[in-house]
From Swiss-Prot:
Primary residence: cytoplasm
Catalysed reactions, semicolon-separated: adenosine(2503) in 23S rRNA + 2 reduced [2Fe-2S]-[ferredoxin] + 2 S-adenosyl-L-methionine = 2-methyladenosine(2503) in 23S rRNA + 5'-deoxyadenosine + L-methionine + 2 oxidized [2Fe-2S]-[ferredoxin] + S-adenosyl-L-homocysteine; adenosine(37) in tRNA + 2 reduced [2Fe-2S]-[ferredoxin] + 2 S-adenosyl-L-methionine = 2-methyladenosine(37) in tRNA + 5'-deoxyadenosine + L-methionine + 2 oxidized [2Fe-2S]-[ferredoxin] + S-adenosyl-L-homocysteine
Leader sequence residues: none
One Gene Ontology biological process: rRNA base methylation
Record organism: Bacillus subtilis (strain 168)
Statement: the UniProt record of this protein carries the keyword DNA damage: no
HAMAP family the UniProt entry points to: RNA_methyltr_RlmN (MF_01849)
The protein's name in its UniProt record: Probable dual-specificity RNA methyltransferase RlmN
Gene3D superfamilies noted in UniProt: 1.10.150.530, Aldolase class I
Job of this protein: Specifically methylates position 2 of adenine 2503 in 23S rRNA and position 2 of adenine 37 in tRNAs.
Length: 363
């Protein structure tokens, strides 16, 4: 049996039977051609994967038995197993998925008036080391394959199928730094955006980075219509370095230059995520400083009242202070909103459920 074209297969993929969810339509067409099959079968395979959401290759009944055997020999469908599922009173659902090698990752379904949004994970753990985040506890174990990211959305969609609902948007803001897994992230974006894939519109997809500057330039050059966000969390270098050690490598002034390049290249505005930490970055003077930093930048600021993480020392900003911060930014002409909080009664903070399960395993 012909192998997949190695120039097309990303180096992060496992050499043994990778998930078929890792491959774009053109890659499957090429594999079919190399194995004596008609390339139009690729569209049929995509239909079985993303519209009918089958659980095995045997269920792909309009494919020949020989082709189904070839698929089963070369690929697996998915390696995700649901280990834990939590449901909040507000409808938020958090999934802990176990991977083929025993590692676990988190995925969150958030319900909004405008639809259902899925927050996906791109890495097992994270190397960035943000001092407020549960995702970095235990460090980085490995990157996810595109198929492991795609399968998160498919798994959540299968859960929604029970109530005839649909995933309407995707945010890449789960565990890990997406730009640390750049090629697999791009493949994921193309697969879920494809009209024969999950067909999620580009403007309903958001990717967030902590600020890996070279990849911001590379992402801008992709000219994708994907929404783009940066985890900023500070109005100046001193505070950002305290909260986010990555700022020591990729400094704030250089980050802002990359932001301007992205905006000029794509014509799109950028979002800044700004977590409010009591007594650290949440004073009115910090809001004034943030407004100075963002002056003339085509952007939106998303203020985030932080979730409590037991392993971290930060405290929540009082509600009236959050509103004062927002009011100050608005008075300076900054487009700003306060993120609606969800999942209070479950392990909602990013990486929190995974960290909790890891603690239970070591007891």
């Amino acid at each position: 049996m012909a192998e997949l074209n190695k120039t097309k297969v990303r180096k992060e993929l496992r050499t043994e039977r990778p998930s078929i969810y890792s491959f774009e339509l053109d890659e499957i067409k090429q594999w079919l051609t190399d194995n004596g099959e008609k390339p139009f079968r690729a569209a049929q395979i995509f239909e079985w994967l993303y519209e009918k959401r089958v659980s095995s290759f045997e269920d792909m009944t309009n494919l020949s038995k020989d082709l189904r055997e070839k698929l089963n020999t070369r690929f697996v469908l998915t390696t995700l197993k649901t280990a834990v599922k939590q449901t909040s009173q507000d409808g938020t659902m958090k999934f802990l998925f176990e991977l083929h090698d025993g590692y676990t990752i988190e995925t969150v379904l958030m319900r909004h008036e405008y639809g259902n949004s899925v927050c996906v994970t791109t890495q097992v753990g994270c190397r960035i080391g943000c001092t407020f985040c549960a995702s970095t506890l235990g460090g980085l174990k490995r990157n996810l394959e595109a198929g492991e990211i795609v399968a998160q959305v498919v798994k959540v969609q299968k859960a929604l199928d029970e109530t005839d609902e649909r995933v309407s948007s995707v945010v890449i803001m789960g565990i890990g730094e997406p730009f640390d897994n750049f090629n697999e992230m791009l493949a994921f974006l193309k697969i879920i955006n494809h009209d024969k894939g999950l067909n999620i519109g580009a403007r309903h997809i958001t990717v967030s980075t902590s600020g890996i500057i070279p990849k911001i330039y590379e992402f801008a050059d992709q000219q994708m219509q994907i929404n783009f966000a940066i985890s900023l969390h500070a109005p100046n270098t001193e505070i950002r370095s305290r909260l986010m050690p990555i700022n020591r490598a990729y400094k704030l002034p250089d980050l802002m230059e990359a932001v301007k390049y992205y905006i000029n290249k794509t014509g799109r505005r950028i979002s800044f995520e700004y977590g409010l930490f009591g007594g650290v970055n949440d004073q009115v003077e910090h809001a004034e400083e943030l407004a100075d930093l963002l002056e003339g930048v085509k952007c939106h600021v998303n203020l985030i009242p932080v979730n409590y993480v037991p392993e971290r020392d930060y405290v929540r900003t009082p509600r009236d202070q959050i509103f004062a911060f927002e009011k100050t930014l608005k008075s300076r002409g900054v487009n700003v909103t306060i993120r609606r909080e969800q999942g209070h009664d479950i392990d909602a903070a990013c990486g929190q459920l995974r960290a909790k399960e890891r603690q239970d395993e070591t007891r």
